[in-house]
Structures are given as structure tokens and as C-alpha cells.
Amino acid sequence: HDIGINQIRLTPPPVIYNEFPEQQLDFALQRKGFEVVRTELTQGVRLDIPEDELLGSFVNKTRTAFRRAEKLGLKFRVIENPTQAEFDRFWEILVENRAGLGVTPAHNRKEIELLHNLVPENLMMAVVEYEGQIISLIWNFGCNSRTVLEFYMAHQEPFQKLRPVPFLT
């Protein structure tokens, strides 16, 4: 019977974010005529590749950018427990990067710090440094034992020519 609803919008998390992937809801909705308008997962990367084969698994453009960044002296560093100064730098680069795209971060700084304080074991920050200065960063969220969500990635525009982002991905 008709209850006056002609459209429902759902944004479920990608199935790989679940500890036990299942798609019963997707199947049931599609069987009733619903359709997927857009999917949020843009890329998935296998992480069980031996480290010495990892670079070879990337597309040529990414491999070239990675090698160039390496030759230019960029350094990759994982930050397990960010200091306040590193958190400040993360926020500064993120806000500047998003402003250049005409947007603001989806979360405010207070929310990000709260998340970090609630589940620090699920969060990982990594940075790319050039001449001792953080120029690019990524903040990852461990969804489960098999999946890591790239929560935020940003770089400083003046250093884009050094191609720091492939170092983070």
C-alpha cells in the first residue's frame, strides 16, 4: 500500500568496512526496484603484497611520481601518537588544502581530536617531509583487521610539483 514516499536515499558504508561483509540489505532493496545511484568507494588496494612487489603493483604514473619524489629527497614517516605540534600542522595543511578546493573539512578540529582521543588505536597519521618540513599528510582509520579508510589526505600546494601524494598512498 502507498504511504506517500517516492524516494529513499541511503549511504551505507562500503561493504569492506565491515568485519563480516554482507549485502543482504542491498540485495533486498535492488530486488524491490531500488537502484544504486552512486558508490562511495573509489579505490581498493590489496595490502598482502610483499613489500618488494608493492611498487610494481601501482600504475605507471604513480610509480614514476613515487620514484621522482624519492630522488628529490622526500621522506615518509608514520606518526603513531601525534604531538600537539604535529596535530596543529595536520590541521593547518588540511584547512589550507580544502580552502584551495573551495570546501572545508567534513569534520571540525574538535571532532577530529575527539575521535583521536576515543579510538587512538584505530587512527594513524603519516606525513611526507621535505627538508625537515611536513608538506603532505594522510590520516587513516582502521575499520577492521583487513580494511583501512583514508580519512583525510592533504598537501601544501607550493610543494605539489614534488609529487608528495604518491608517497602516502
Feature map (PLM): residue ranges:
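Conserved acetyl-CoA-binding loop-helix of GNAT-fold acetyltransferases
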Residues: 1, 160-169
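Conserved GNAT acetyl-CoA-binding A-motif
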Residues: 3-15
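Alpha-helix C-cap/termination motif
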Residues: 2-3, 118
